[in-house]
Amino acid sequence: MAKYTMDMVLQYAKVFPENADYGDPKGNRVAKSIADKGGQYIVQGYFTDPDQISQLLEDGLDPEPMNSPRIIDGDAQYGIGKYMKLKRMVKDVKNFTDRYGKPFEKDYGGAPNIVNLTNGMDKKTLWNFEEDGPLGNGTKAKVQFETYSNGAGVRLLNVGITEHVPYTSGEPTEDDKMFMVG
């Protein structure tokens, strides 16, 4: 497994227990699958330099696992306009056998560490969802992730927030208000 830490711009960051994607047991196939697995922490991490993508591909990242592009063209206002979905399951237990034949479990899931680096490394703290708030689109961060299964898998590990953009839910437009009753 190779581990990377990259400067990225975040979009749709659902990286806290309070806002993780827990799926929907009554939703579409994908939503049901996420719900069945207990949910996921997920973010679209926009690259800030084309060399980041080159490094990953040179190191063996599978650019199209299961015939689905890994590097996706996105919103040009974030980074270089290309992103990768980075996720981590809420619970991701794998069974292994040690060298003595004894079985053991390892959980690769759980919430990633979210660290507040906005005041510098010497004043870093854990991000507090209630006090610091959710992460808005355009938040800048140092994102740590690892690749596994010969580059076919990518797992989110940690996020260090360097520049916070507050989350806004999007106020209704005048057109939206026209259809709101009560």
Regions found by a protein language model. Name each.
Residues 1-6, 165-182:
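Acidic, gly/ser/pro-rich intrinsically disordered tails
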Residues 91-96, 112-118, 164:
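Short regulatory "switch" loops immediately downstream of catalytic or recognition motifs
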Residues 146-169:
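OB-fold/S1-family single-stranded nucleic acid-binding modules
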